[in-house]
């Protein structure tokens, strides 16, 4: 019953690891090559419709959300940290993102901090951000929604959660 799977496209990009977000002029700063995985949707026409950036430090959770999104015919880029997601978004290395789905609790920068940075950015503020968490903490959920999160999903994320979100965001 499984359709022919398309292998995710792997790319490597160079990003700045300097502590200043957005850079400035100059140069300087350390740079490193980082892997980015873009999983294509099954239908060619669907690929251009919806592109989701999935951010989670758990490789299992990244794989689950990517599989659910691909089964719904969306293109998915996965990254393992909010810091990496923000770098790629600010550098324009993940073009045409229609939605960001991020875990709340990650080392370094949390999903909540990513949400705040996205909403403060004139370039990125229109991108809907959805927060996911395995912890049902009402104050945390309220705080994320007040900061502009499109939704807050409890893990494990189900295909029906993704369908509901994507139909609202198109």
From Swiss-Prot:
> What keywords tag this UniProt record?
Cytokinin signaling pathway, Phosphoprotein, Transcription, Transcription regulation, Two-component regulatory system
> CDD domains this protein is in?
REC_typeA_ARR
Q: What family is reported?
A: Belongs to the ARR family. Type-A subfamily.
SMART domains assigned to the protein according to its UniProt record, in alphabetical order: REC (SM00448)
At what positions is 4-aspartylphosphate found?
103
Tissue-level expression: Expressed in mature leaves and flowers, and at low levels in roots and shoots.
The protein's matches in SUPFAM superfamilies, at most eight in alphabetical order, are given as: CheY-like
What is the recorded post-translational modification?
A: Two-component system major event consists of a His-to-Asp phosphorelay between a sensor histidine kinase (HK) and a response regulator (RR). In plants, the His-to-Asp phosphorelay involves an additional intermediate named Histidine-containing phosphotransfer protein (HPt). This multistep phosphorelay consists of a His-Asp-His-Asp sequential transfer of a phosphate group between first a His and an Asp of the HK protein, followed by the transfer to a conserved His of the HPt protein and finally the transfer to an Asp in the receiver domain of the RR protein.
**What is the source species?**
Oryza sativa subsp. indica (Rice)
Question: Per the entry, what induces it?
Answer: By cytokinin and salt stress.
Which terms under GO biological process does the entry name?
cytokinin-activated signaling pathway; phosphorelay signal transduction system
The Response regulatory domain is annotated at 51-170
Q: Which domain of life is it from?
A: Eukaryota
**Entry-linked Gene3D superfamilies:** 3.40.50.2300
User: Which protein are we looking at?
Assistant: Two-component response regulator ORR6
Stated role? Functions as a response regulator involved in His-to-Asp phosphorelay signal transduction system. Phosphorylation of the Asp residue in the receiver domain activates the ability of the protein to promote the transcription of target genes. Type-A response regulators seem to act as negative regulators of the cytokinin signaling.
């Amino acid at each position: 019953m499984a359709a022919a799977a398309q292998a995710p496209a792997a790319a490597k990009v160079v990003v700045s690891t300097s502590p200043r977000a957005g850079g400035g002029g100059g140069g300087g700063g350390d740079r490193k090559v980082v892997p980015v995985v873009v999983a294509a949707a099954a239908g060619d026409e669907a690929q251009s419709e919806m592109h989701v950036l999935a951010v989670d430090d758990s490789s299992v959770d990244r794989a689950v959300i990517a599989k659910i999104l691909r089964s719904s015919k969306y293109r998915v880029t996965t990254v393992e940290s909010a810091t990496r997601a923000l770098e790629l978004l600010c550098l324009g290395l993940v073009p045409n993102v229609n939605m960001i789905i991020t875990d709340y609790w990650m080392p370094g920068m949390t999903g909540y901090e990513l949400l705040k940075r996205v909403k403060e950015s004139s370039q990125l503020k229109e991108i809907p951000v959805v927060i996911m968490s395995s912890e049902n903490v009402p104050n945390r959920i309220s705080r994320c929604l007040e900061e502009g999160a499109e939704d807050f999903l409890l893990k494990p994320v189900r295909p029906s959660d993704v369908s509901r979100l994507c139909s609202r965001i198109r």
